[in-house]
Amino acid sequence: MGVISEFKAFAVKGNVVDMAVGIIIGAAFGKIVSSFVGDVVMPPIGLLIGGVDFGDLAITLKAAQGDVPAVVLAYGKFIQSVIDFVIVAFAIFMGVKAINRLKREEAVAPSLPPTPTKEEVLLGEIRDLLKAQNDKPLP
């Protein structure tokens, strides 16, 4: 089997396609959460603590000199990233929790015993006949 045909077989498998879709949706969800945090959550929080824009919070370690930019610790952006992470982690946690609950409900549902196959029925009849023959008294 050639490399290209092996790759096709790998790429077409359901798990790989599902994983790729999950990664794409996850990246899009991350952008939505970043926008939500930066544009919806942080402005009111900044307003509550005195009109601070968290994106601008930084400590200058070395001032800019000519063409050399300043060296800064942009801890405001870090705070926003931490909040992004917490929201994404919480959303994933809630999703996994819901999936686990559905799996538990499926496991709890009683399953009917499987119906015996024709061979199993025939073997049972043979067993019963042999048992009946062995239980007869000897002449």
UniProtKB/Swiss-Prot annotation:
Bilayer-crossing regions: 9-29, 79-99
Keywords assigned by UniProt, alphabetized: Cell inner membrane, Cell membrane, Ion channel, Ion transport, Membrane, Transmembrane, Transmembrane helix, Transport
SUPFAM superfamilies: Gated mechanosensitive channel (SSF81330)
Known function: Channel that opens in response to stretch forces in the membrane lipid bilayer. May participate in the regulation of osmotic pressure changes within the cell.
Molecular function in Gene Ontology: mechanosensitive monoatomic ion channel activity
Subcellular location: Cell inner membrane
Family that this chain belongs to: Belongs to the MscL family.
Membrane-topology descriptor: Multi-pass membrane protein
GO cellular component: plasma membrane
Gene responsible for this protein: mscL
Keyword Transmembrane helix: yes
InterPro entries documented for this protein: Mechanosensitive_channel_CS, MS_channel, MSC/AndL, MscL_channel
Predominant cellular place of this UniProt entry's protein: membrane
Database matches in HAMAP family: MscL (MF_00115)
Assembly behavior: Homopentamer.
Protein name: Large-conductance mechanosensitive channel
